[in-house]
Amino acid sequence: MLDLKRIRTDFDTVAAKLKNRGVSEDTLTHLKELDEKRRTLLVQSEELKAGRNIASAAIAQAKRQKEDATQQIADMQKVSADIKTIDNQLVAIDQQVADIITVLPNTPHDSVPVGADEEDNVEIRRWGTPRDFDFEVKAHWDLGEDLDILDWERGAKVTGARFLFYKNLGARLERALYNFMLDEHIKEGYQEIITPYMVNHDSMFGTGQYPKFKEDTFELADTNFVLIPTAEVPLTNYYRGEILDGKELPIYFTAMSPSFRSEAGSAGRDTRGLIRLHQFHKVEMVKFAKPEESYQELEKMTANAENILQKLGLPYRVISLCTGDMGFSAAKTYDLEVWIPAQNTYREISSCSNTEDFQARRAQIRYRDEADGKVKLLHTLNGSGLAVGRTVAAILENYQNEDGSVTIPEVLRPYMGGETVISPK
């Protein structure tokens, strides 16, 4: 959530930054007008309350002296009614301000490219060279069925579209991947966490999914619970409402969890395969950092995600998302896109973001600065390290062989009992 004081004092800068994120200046102007009206009413209310206190003392004095205070009482009752009217107006204005400010996206960092959509994203670097196949490549969904490791038909029967069963070496490959990812992140100083897979509405507000993106989630009817769309939500909210010791920062968390997405608005997109599911595993990285260190931590986090792809030998590229393509809470985002041979393109497999103090303000996560003793908002960062199902897809396609088998990447073999290849039965 943005700082209302910042909007008030640096209106033109904030308006210009949010314009690049598709926010109309009229929206901010209306917010500013509401804020000014609110501040005027607060002054009036305080003045009336001060006058009422004086009148109350005068009435008490008159009664002690057995004087007639009828008119003074009537005047004070009118003042009290005026105060109540103003307070009711303030409640209404506060709600209008909240309705606007809670759905305003974060302001982009100055280094973020300006653009409308993914066409304006900027490629930063590439790693690895896509393999030149001398046979016709298969899509991962066909490989999965032929190898008897992915079962889409029964997933649809048991649950519905965009669900599947992993089986045999497919299940072992999925498990090997997330254990490998967690082990690599732990080496980099991340604390492993097992989170709840349901959170409450306050947690969804804290990380920015609520109220704007409720349609993308799975809520449990008649409860305060929501299935997590990413482990970012419980990990970030771990410290919600707390003041941390600045000496302990930065703090790194990692967790593997299922992620549940309704994929509202994705009808017709990636209807086959592991790219877009309602339920999938993801290894998440979350950081809590001091403001002056957060962009260095973003680079480190992105490197941590890249490390996984490099050790798996999967070609990828790093993209800096433009202002029009970033997520709601992000101030800057790098996407990692892995090469998918059957589609002859790169597809997102990780997204690493610095939200600066946007989530921390919503969730009230602060730290006490050891330098001056002041309590300040910290910065939160989050990143995929990696989306496990998409990594399975990338391995199946990039490591496929002409005979229909798939070679298991060397770093995963210790996690799979020494297996070296997945072969057709």
Curated annotation (Swiss-Prot):
PROSITE patterns: AA_TRNA_LIGASE_II
Signal peptide positions (record): none
Record-listed E.C. numbers: 6.1.1.11
Keywords from the named record: Aminoacyl-tRNA synthetase, ATP-binding, Cytoplasm, Ligase, Nucleotide-binding, Protein biosynthesis
InterPro entries assigned to the protein according to its UniProt record, in alphabetical order: aa-tRNA-synt_IIb, aa-tRNA-synth_II, aa-tRNA-synth_II/BPL/LPL, Ser-tRNA-ligase_type_1, Ser-tRNA-synth_1_N, SerRS_1_N_sf, SerRS_core, tRNA-bd_arm
Reactions it catalyzes: tRNA(Ser) + L-serine + ATP = L-seryl-tRNA(Ser) + AMP + diphosphate + H(+); tRNA(Sec) + L-serine + ATP = L-seryl-tRNA(Sec) + AMP + diphosphate + H(+)
Main location: cytoplasm
SUPFAM superfamilies hit by this protein: Class II aaRS and biotin synthetases, tRNA-binding arm
Compartments (UniProt record): Cytoplasm
Subunit-level organization: Homodimer. The tRNA molecule binds across the dimer.
Function comment: Catalyzes the attachment of serine to tRNA(Ser). Is also able to aminoacylate tRNA(Sec) with serine, to form the misacylated tRNA L-seryl-tRNA(Sec), which will be further converted into selenocysteinyl-tRNA(Sec).
Record protein name field: Serine--tRNA ligase
Primary gene name: serS
